[in-house]
């Protein structure tokens, strides 16, 4: 989560809508811009462009295709450190591959050995990019490719890039945080029956634990990410539903 959001300092989508340079009030003045900010945040956070916005439902939500490039540019101008991190991460991956020397960028690192490029996560877990190569992409830039399972579920050469590497790291770190939270919950004798994205579904007697107690377990920091703002919310009911 955004650190300021986790500390209760505002609405992340409304803050992202500040890129439109006008006041934004949910269900109020310029409230429609909050939705544009939400779409931009979800679609552009990992380097997405017009195609990403469209796949997130931008056109169905009333945005026009010719205004999408302006939204993308505004989001990137409002988030220069994120954009810089995309390119710094790609550079670190490329350098590790070319030189064989470990490259650290923020809390992650890249190493290249045994014919594999490794992304080293803060938890110590590693993501593998098998048989990497540098090849020109459709835009004429050199990009990193590797062997893996594509969207057609077949083994083939895959292309990655700055934003996608950051997405890999972000989702993998989030997974590691959730996995440790699930271990803590299980250690307290609670029965996890499923998990959906960042949610845990628990089947338990009504008087075993309160929602607040379970949220506290979910919000504990693993030893490898002390200081990272974590927050959890939950509900109890007779069946699962989206809160």
Residue ranges and their predicted role:
Residues 1, 7-243:
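Conserved catalytic core of nucleotide polymerization and phosphodiester-bond processing enzymes
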């Amino acid at each position: 989560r955004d650190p300021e959001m986790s500390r209760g300092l505002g609405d992340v989508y409304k803050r992202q809508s500040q890129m439109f340079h006008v006041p934004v009030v949910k269900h109020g003045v310029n409230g429609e811009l909050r939705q544009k900010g939400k779409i931009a945040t979800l679609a552009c956070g990992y380097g997405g462009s017009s195609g990403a916005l469209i796949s997130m439902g931008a056109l169905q939500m009333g945005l026009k295709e010719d205004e999408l490039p302006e939204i993308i540019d505004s989001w990137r101008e409002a988030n220069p450190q994120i954009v810089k991190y995309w390119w710094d991460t790609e550079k670190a991956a490329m350098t590790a591959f070319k030189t064989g020397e470990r490259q650290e960028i923020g809390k992650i690192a890249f190493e290249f050995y045994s014919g594999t490029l490794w992304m080293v996560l803060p938890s110590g877990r590693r993501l593998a990019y098998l048989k990497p190569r540098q090849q020109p992409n459709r835009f004429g830039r050199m990009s990193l490719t590797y062997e893996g399972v594509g969207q057609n579920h077949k083994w083939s050469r895959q292309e990655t890039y700055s934003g996608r590497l950051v997405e890999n790291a972000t989702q993998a770190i989030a997974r590691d945080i959730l996995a440790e939270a699930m271990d803590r919950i299980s250690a307290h004798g609670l029965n996890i029956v499923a998990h959906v994205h960042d949610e845990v579904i628990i089947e338990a007697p009504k008087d075993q634990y309160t929602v607040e107690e379970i949220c506290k377990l979910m919000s504990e920091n693993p030893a490898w990410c002390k200081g990272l703002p974590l927050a959890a919310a939950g509900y109890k009911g007779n069946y699962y539903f989206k809160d």
